[in-house]
Amino acid sequence: DGVINGALAAKSKHIIADGRTFSYVLSNGQHMIQVTQNDVRAIQLAKAALYAGIRLLMERMEIKTVDRIRLAGAFGSHIDVKYAMVLGLIPDCDLEQVSSAGNAAGTGARIALLNYESRQEIEEVVREVEKVETAVEANFQEHFVQAMAFPHKVDSFPNLAKVIELPAETDLQNNADSNQHRK
């Protein structure tokens, strides 16, 4: 659920009180580096929006799973795909089929500038693009809320489970129930 568990503070020097919440200390050298509850929430909001958008596109295409994922730009070039999936930034997929496309926008722009036939083909594809306005999509909010959990509240991640141990669904439900009692 993204809550830094304060009950673990007695067991770990990395978890410290931070006002009404807790933080996870990465380094306590000359400058303390810590992950705060607000940091976790910001990641949750960003990844939930991305994942919800992906789910809307999957629904439009009437597909349940993806065979491959290409991540573009500097973000896609530097992120560890396993941890992107652990966070739930991307849907479950064979990790060998997730890769970086590099500077896809720059490459596409060069191709369009230097090759007339390619430019014509790109223009044809652009005319076929269908805009999906997430703000008016009925399922967006539901997908967004479900995607707030790490990696996801209801979607399974069988490919990810092959490389890391995921919490059991009962563990997730028990944690959610205990958080409801706190409020």
Regions found by a protein language model. Give the residues of each.
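Helical "lid/coupling" subdomains associated with nucleotide-phosphate turnover
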Residues: 1-183
